[in-house]
Structure formats: C-alpha cells, structure tokens
Amino acid sequence: MLIAITGTPGVGKTTVAKLLAKKLNYEYVSLKDFALEKGCGRRVNDEVEVEIDELAYFIERELKGKNAVLDGHLSHLMPVDLVVVLRAHPKLIGERLRERGYDREKIGENVEAELVDAVLIEAIEEHENVIEVDTTNKSPEDVVEEIVSLINSGIKKRVGIVDWSEVYDEIIPYLRLGGE
C-alpha cells in the first residue's frame, strides 16, 4: 500500500512519515529526494520545484504495488492508496515556520492555507481514501498510533474533523505580520 503523508509545512509530515514507515515496516520515501533523484525536481533557492506529472509517473512506475510511505507537501497529488492529511493549529504552524526562518509572507501563506483547509480540499478532490488527523497537542508517536488504528479498523475516509474558524482572531498576527 502506498500511503501519502501530506499537510501544510510545519504540521510534522517528515517526523510522522518516518515513524509510520518504521512502525509498518514500509519504505520511507521523501518526495523531494525522489524527485531530485529521478530528474523531475530541481533546487531553486531553499525549495525543490517539481514537475508533478513526471513525479507521478515515476511513483506509478517504481513504487506502485510496494509498501511505502510518501512524505511531502505534494504527496496527495500522487497515485497512492491512502492520503493522510496532517493538520495543526495555525498559530502552532506560524511559530514553527518562524523558528525555521521562513519570511513573513511565506508564514502568512502557510497559516492561511491551514486555516482554509487548502491541502485537505486538494486531497479530497484527488482521492477517495483520505484521512484527516489533527496533530495539535499530540506527540508524533500518538499521531502514528492514531493513523495505524484508523488503518487497522478499515477506515478509508475521515475528513471534516478540524475547524479553525473559531481561532481566526488568534492567528490574525500570523496572517498580517508573520507572527510578530
């Protein structure tokens, strides 16, 4: 089974994806590294720009039928069996991205994306099997246990469990000023 771990930057994708792969004894695949290795991604400043259709082709050709956890912001756009959309309180995302040195504009974009469910909506538009998991106030290990429990119970769709509309006032500073 191919499992995509996706979400807004700062939700904990890489940590959770690595732990989940280990727990399930699946291969861990960083989409950025995979794209660079296959020649369908290139470094631009601090980011990797990816040709999505080419990347999907290589995923289909080289990973379909294998057990792997795909880690990356674009993993929900790949041909996978299950998409896990990680969510986190927008204020927490703003704080994490500020600690990573993101500029104000990038922090604002990502906080807004989390606020309006951007990644979740894209995932639902692309796939039938989508599970949403709120990582706020949970350890990565607890998040992995929740994902494994959902998979083992046969749940293939669980969305709509997160609603950040009530915290809008808390995150206005991140939208306007990058958290300052």
Curated annotation (Swiss-Prot):
Cited function: Broad-specificity nucleoside monophosphate (NMP) kinase that catalyzes the reversible transfer of the terminal phosphate group between nucleoside triphosphates and monophosphates. Also has ATPase activity. Involved in the late maturation steps of the 30S ribosomal particles, specifically 16S rRNA maturation. While NMP activity is not required for ribosome maturation, ATPase activity is. Associates transiently with small ribosomal subunit protein uS11. ATP hydrolysis breaks the interaction with uS11.
Residues of the signal peptide: none
Matching PANTHER family: ADENYLATE KINASE ISOENZYME 6, POS9-ACTIVATING FACTOR FAP7-RELATED
A family per Pfam: AAA_18
Keywords carried by this UniProt record: ATP-binding, Kinase, Nucleotide-binding, Ribosome biogenesis, rRNA processing, Transferase
Protein name as annotated: Putative adenylate kinase
Family classification: Belongs to the adenylate kinase family. AK6 subfamily.
Group of enzyme by EC: transferase
NCBIfam families hit by this protein: PRK03839.1 (NF003012)
Region named NMP: 30-50
Record's catalysed reaction(s): AMP + ATP = 2 ADP; ATP + H2O = ADP + phosphate + H(+)
Keyword Magnesium included in the entry's annotation: no
Binding positions (ATP): 10, 12-15, 100, 138
InterPro entries assigned to the protein according to its UniProt record, in alphabetical order: Adenyl_kinase_AK6 (IPR020618), P-loop_NTPase (IPR027417)
Organism: Pyrococcus horikoshii (strain ATCC 700860 / DSM 12428 / JCM 9974 / NBRC 100139 / OT-3)
GO molecular function, one term: ATP hydrolysis activity
EC number(s) per entry: 2.7.4.3
Subunit structure: Interacts with uS11. Not a structural component of 40S pre-ribosomes, but transiently interacts with them by binding to uS11.
Transmembrane residue ranges: none
Residue span of region LID: 99-109
Gene Ontology process terms (BP): ribosomal small subunit biogenesis; rRNA processing
